[in-house]
Every structure is written in C-alpha cells, then in structure tokens.
C-alpha cells in the first residue's frame, strides 16, 4: 500500500529551495511536534523519496526505515547504504500499489504529484500560525 505524509502551510506550500518553509521561532514548537508525528508514522516502515528529498538528507537514508529512492535521469550518488533501494517510478507503483506493506511517500512535490492518486492513506498536517 502506498501512503503519503506531508506538512503544509495554509497556502499549500510544502517546501522552498529544497528545505521546509517553516523556520524560525514562531514555528519551533509546531515543527518539533510535526517531526515527532513524522517519526511515529514512518519509523519501522518503508519510505520512498525523490532526488531532491534524498539530496536534502545529504544522501543519507532515514534510520530505522527501508528507504526507496526513485531513479530518474539524474546522476545517482555512488556507494549507497544497504537500506537504500533504487527503483524507477513505474516499477515502484506496480510493486506497491496493491501491496499489504505500507510504503510512505515523504516527498518531494513531484513525487507527491505522481503518488497521491495511488495513496490509500494521506497523513497531512497544516501549520496555522498567527502572524
């Protein structure tokens, strides 16, 4: 089963320049709670990510998860850890759309655009912050 997890601002923004758009003191506590939620949802499961998300993690997999990295035409980093599986998007969808195993899409936006229609569960957080 494919699922997706993301947090967003009320304007729909989920990222900015390969980073999260909520930074600074006013977002500190809610961002901490949302990262805790992210960890609780994804830990012990498989996750799937695109190139920019993997790059934002400095090409290091998330701990305590099997990491699927979607192959595109971009150059791939060499010597990836054993818990990173390289797979193309069509093979990924075929393998997991009807699987009992939950694989959580963690971004980025292009991968969400492709996988949301296959996601049986969507974990969405919206950050409402008073200015």
Language model segments and positions:
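N-terminal nucleotide/polyanion-binding subdomain common to many enzyme families
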Residues: 1-101, 111-124, 129
């Amino acid at each position: 089963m494919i699922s997706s997890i993301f947090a967003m601002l009320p304007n729909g923004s989920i990222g900015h320049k390969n980073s999260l758009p909520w930074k600074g003191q006013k977002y500190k506590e809610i961002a901490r709670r949302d990262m805790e939620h992210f960890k609780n949802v994804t830990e012990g499961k498989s996750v799937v990510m695109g190139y920019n998300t993997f790059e934002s993690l400095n090409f290091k997999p998330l701990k305590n998860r099997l990491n699927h990295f979607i192959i595109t035409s971009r150059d791939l980093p060499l010597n990836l850890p054993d818990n990173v599986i390289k797979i193309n998007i069509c093979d990924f969808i075929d393998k997991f759309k009807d699987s009992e195993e939950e694989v959580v899409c963690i971004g980025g936006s292009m991968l969400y655009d492709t996988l949301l229609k296959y996601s049986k569960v969507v974990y969405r957080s919206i950050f409402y912050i008073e200015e």
